[in-house]
C-alpha cells in the first residue's frame, strides 16, 4: 500500500485548483456507497498518492492523504466560473437533435449554445408534459455523465432529505432487489456512482466510459428516484434512517440506523458543529436554518408518513433538473428520458420547493456554543472563534461573483495570502476554521476564524479579523500577489484537471448552482469574457479599485454578521449519551410487556430481512455487462526509460495541452531513524520558508506567477518479495512547457536555497499539524486505526505511522515544547535531512508531456540535475521498526467508533493471485456491507488487501458497535467457505474489480501511476498476468482464500478509535481485550 504524507502548504495545483468537495464547506454532503461513505471525512486529510480512481478509492479506505483542507482550492472560489475546458473536439459523433425529433419525444428545445470553454454543444430542453428541464451537453469526452437533481428543502432537522437519498437506491419498481445500488457497485465499470445531499437539493450522478454500462446506470437511477420501493416499505426507512432496536425484552432499547450513526459522527467533530451552527445562524428564516443531514437529537422524530410525503412532494419530474454529458447519442438521451417522464403529469412542486431569500440583519449576532472535547491538555486553550457574513440578499451578477472569488483567493488562497498569514502568525490560534467564501447556496457566505484559541484571546481574534480586513480595504494588495493569483486561475482553466472526478460532473455541479434556483444554467459554464473583463478592469483601474469596494460593502459595512465562539466541554459527549439513554428508558417504561415483545419481534424481523440475500432470479433483473465487454489487456502508458547526466529519467509521451508535469524522486533510505518524524515538517518548510534573497511570501508569489504549482511529500510502501520498503521524497511540479526552465529553477531554489531559520513559522507548522491530526482522529478514525495496525505488521507501515499516525501526533506534542527549548538543534536536524536526502545519487526524474515538449525540456532538466549535490554519506540505513503486536484502543470524545482488525496473509504461505482483488471487493460489498452497515448500523464497513505487504485488514466507520463488529470480521472465513455463488454473481464481481483496475485517468495521472509502478517493480507483464487471474477467478479461489484470511481471526491485531465508555464496556466483557491509549 502506498502511503504519502504531504506538507500543509502543498502548492500542487491538483490539490490547489480542483478539490471538488471545497464546493461544500458548510453544506452537508451525504455519500451513499460504502466506499463513498469514506470519502467525505478523508477530504480533510492531506494528499493522495495516485490521482487514479482505483488508487484514490484504495488509499482513502486506508485513511491516507488527499489535499489538505488548509490548501485553498481556486475551484472553490471560482466554482461558478472556472469551468475546465474539456480537451475534446467539439464536433459530435452523432447528429444534432432537431426540433421535430425533440417534439416527437415530448420535448421542446428552449435554448442552444456552443460553450467554447468546454468545447461542447449544450442544449436546454423542457419536457412539455411535466416541465422537467434537461441539459444535454455533447462533445467527444468518453467519460459520460448523467445526473438528476431535485430541489429538496427540509423544514426541520430530522434529516428527511438525507435519509431519502440513502433509501431510494434500496430497490425500485423495475429492480426490486434489496439494494440495486450495491449490485452496480459490484459489477459496473462506473467512473462515478454516488448520491449526495445539499442543504437544499439532492443529487444523483453516475458516470462511465462504457456506453452500455452508462445506460444501465442511468436506468437504475431513474427508476430509483421516481419509483422507489422505500415509500411502501418501512423496513428501508428503519434501516437507513432510524428505528428502536431491542433484541430481548430484558435488555435496553437502543437507536439504530445508518444515517443516525453517520450524523452522530458528524456531530462529534468540532469543525462540523461550527459549520452547521454558522449556516443555521446566518439563515434562520429559510431552509438553511435547519440541518438537511439530520441532527441525531431530531432524527428519531421523523415518521414514515412524513418520509413518504416528502418523496411524493419533491421527487417529481416537474421539480427535477436532468443533465447528460459526453460522447453518447443525444437523441437516445431524450428517448430514455421520455419513457419515464411521460408517465407523469405536471406538478406544483416547483412552487413549494422554491427557496426564499434570507433578509439581511439590521445588527450583528453573537453566539456562544459548546463542543465535545477530551480532558487532556489545557481546555482554556481550546476555544474556537469564527466571524461569518451573509454577503447579499439578492443574487450577485457574474462580474461580482468572479471578483469576489478572486478576492477570496487573494486573502486566503495561499500561505502567503495576507488574511491567512496574519491570523496564523498572530499566535492567537493554531489553525484556520470556516475559512473563506461559500457560494454554492442561494446566497453567498464568508467566514473566517481560528481554533486552538486561549480563552483570554477570543475577543482579540475577532478584533484582528476586522482590523486586517479594514487594512486590506485601505491598502489593497501587492501587484505580485494579484499577478500570481491570476496566473493560478488561468493555469487551472487551461489544465482542465479534475483528477479522478469526472469533468462532466464538475460542469454539472457548477451549472446546477444557478439552474436549481431557476437561473441561467449556461452562465456558470462561460468564464472567458467575464475573466477577460476583470483582467482589463484591474489593468486599467488597479486592483484596489476592484477589490476594496467589495470588502467594504459586502463585509465591513454589512451588519448581517454572526460571531460564534465555541467552548470546549469535556462533559458534553457523556451528557448527550446520558440524555439519549434517559429518553430510551422512558420509551421502554411506557411500553407494556406486549409492546416489548412486539418490538423484539420487529427487531428480529428487520435483521432477518437484512441478512437474507436476494434470490438469484431477482438479482438478474439488475442490468450488467458480460466478460465479453471487458478488454483482455490493461491500459499501457507509453514509457521511455533513459538518463540525463547519469540520472534515470522516465518519459511519458502524452497529450497534456502544452503542460509539462514532472516528479523528482529522492530516496529516504539513508536517513537516520530519529529524523523520520521530522520529514513532513521538513517538506512544509521547503515550501513555506524563505531564502537568503526572498521572503517566503515572495517565493510563494513567484511560484504562483511562473508555474502551476509545486509540492513536496514523502511516500512509503512495502515492496512485494523484499524486506526493505520503498521510501521516497517526491517533489512534484507543473508549468506551461514554455516555462519549464522557471519550474526547474524554482524547484532547485526550494531544495537548496530555502533557509531553516524562522523559528516562529516552524512553530506554526507544528501547531497546525497537531490541530490537523487531532481533527483526523475525530473525523477519520478508520485511517488512524489502519495506520496503527500497519505499523505493527510491516516496516513501511511503521514509517508511515511515524509521519502521519498517532505516533506522529505524540511527536508533535513533544516537538511543540522543544521548538522553544532547542530551536538550534531542530534547525540543524532539518539541514541534516536536506544533506541526507536531496542528492543526485539515487534520484529519478519522471516527466509527462507531448514528445516535442519532452525533448525541449531536457536542457532545463540537465541544468537542474547538475546543480544537485552528490551525497557523500555512508549508504543506506537498515529500517526494521515496528510497533508491538497488541490490541489497542485509542480514546477520543466521540459518539461513534472506528473499528479495525488486520493480519499478514503472506505469513500463512499464501502466494498472490489476482483473484484476491475480486474476493476482497466481494467481501466488502456483501458480507461486510450487510452485517456492519445494513444490520449493524455503521456508516461504512469494508476490507482491504495490500498486495505489496500482504496485510489484509477490516475497517468500519462511524460504527455504533465495537466487539460485535470484530466478531463479524472473524466470521469472514466461514462466510467464504459457505459461499455458493452462481456464474452471474461471479462475473459481476470480476467486472467490478476490472472497473477498479482500469480506472479512468487523465494524462498526469497516467504518468504518475507509471512512476509508482516503476518504483515498486510492477511490470506490464505482471499486470497482464494479474488481469488474467482476475478474469478467470473461480468459486474455488474464494474457498481457498478463506484459509488465508483466517490468520486475521487467529493472529490478527485489533485497533479501535472509540469512546471511553465503549472501550470500558469491551474490556469488561472480554477481560482487558484492549490496551488503552488516550489521544484527545
Swiss-Prot record:
This is Presequence protease 1, chloroplastic/mitochondrial. Binds 1 zinc ion per subunit. It is found in: Plastid, Chloroplast stroma; Mitochondrion matrix. Gene3D superfamilies: Metalloenzyme, LuxS/M16 peptidase-like (3.30.830.10). GO terms for cellular component: apoplast; chloroplast; chloroplast envelope; chloroplast stroma; cytosol; mitochondrial matrix; mitochondrion. Residues 571-612 form a coiled coil. The gene is PREP1. ATP-independent protease that degrades both mitochondrial and chloroplastic transit peptides after their cleavage. Also degrades other unstructured peptides. Specific for peptides in the range of 10 to 65 residues. Shows a preference for cleavage after small polar residues and before basic residues, with a bias for positively charged amino acid residues. GO terms for biological process: protein processing. The keyword Plastid applies. The keyword Metal-binding applies. Keywords: Acetylation, Chloroplast, Coiled coil, Hydrolase, Magnesium, Metal-binding, Metalloprotease, Mitochondrion, Plastid, Protease, Transit peptide, Zinc. Changing residue 933 to A/K: Loss of activity.
